[in-house]
Amino acid sequence: MSSNLKKEETMDLDQQEFNGNAISPVLPDGLKNYLIDIDGTITDDVPNEESWRMETCLPYLGSVDTINDWYSEGHIITFFTSRTENHRKVTEEWLQNHGYFYHNLLMNKPRGGNYHWIDNHIVRATRYEGKWTKMTKKKLNIEVFE
């Protein structure tokens, strides 16, 4: 992977404490950790069983510019995909060839959708529905613990 496409430096995050014990650091206000799917989100939905298509599919219109803008603004960009480790090389080359800037690539996301993420940090979900445009804020009902 080309060094200009992956930030190697570590972020200076404030170490937080809880009851005298160190806990995971938190991003500064205004910065986000973007976890972005690949297949069906920034390019065609290519299943692992048809991996020969991974090299030739094209990015969705606006995805490169939007993601690279977030990267330039200082946000953390992580691609999180159901592609297996066997597909890492072709995936990294595809991202590089199409000019995506990112920090991390996580493979082996569980397949099948219907994701339910439980975390002690704020989690926001945005469902991609066919168009890369500016984000807007809307209030919706969500499922929470009582």
Describe every region a protein language model picked out.
Residues 2-146:
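HAD-like aspartate-dependent phosphatase fold
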